[in-house]
């Protein structure tokens, strides 16, 4: 996966709600490592599925992002979560 591309995809499509790994809509459903583990979202496959299909207030991005963009952003989210969203 291309983490630099994932960062661009995140910035352009995800950061409005998930800036710095947070969640402005549902405060407990963050992209922080602990929350990803708690909610079973701590794998690329789980993140890819949610990005493709959406859930609750989160829209589906299948058809809006390519498979490659979705894979890259999933890898970026896991990488940032492992680093504590420190950049």
Curated annotation (Swiss-Prot):
Keyword Thylakoid (UniProt): yes
Subcellular location: Cellular thylakoid lumen
Gene3D superfamilies reported in the protein's UniProt record: Cytochrome c-like domain
PTM comment text: Binds 1 heme c group covalently per subunit.
Chief localization: other
GO MF entries: electron transfer activity; heme binding; iron ion binding
Record's GO cellular component terms: plasma membrane-derived thylakoid lumen
Annotated positions binding heme c: 14, 17-18, 58
InterPro entries: Cyt_c-like_dom, Cyt_c-like_dom_sf, Cyt_C6, Cyt_C_IC
GO biological process: photosynthesis
Key words of the record: Electron transport, Heme, Iron, Metal-binding, Photosynthesis, Thylakoid, Transport
Subunit and interaction comment: Monomer.
Alphabetized NCBIfam families for the sequence: Cytc6PetJCyano
HAMAP family per record: Cytc_PetJ
Family: Belongs to the cytochrome c family. PetJ subfamily.
Function recorded in the entry: Functions as an electron carrier between membrane-bound cytochrome b6-f and photosystem I in oxygenic photosynthesis.
Protein name: Cytochrome c6
Gene name tied to this protein: petJ
């Amino acid at each position: 996966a291309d983490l630099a591309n994932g960062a661009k995809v995140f910035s352009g499509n995800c950061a409005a709600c998930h800036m710095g790994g947070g969640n402005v809509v549902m405060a407990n459903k963050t992209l922080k490592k602990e929350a990803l583990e708690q909610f079973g979202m701590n794998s690329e496959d789980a993140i890819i599925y949610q990005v493709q299909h959406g859930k609750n207030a989160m829209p589906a991005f299948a058809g809006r992002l390519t498979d490659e963009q979705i894979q890259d952003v999933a890898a970026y989210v896991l990488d940032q979560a492992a680093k504590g969203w420190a950049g």
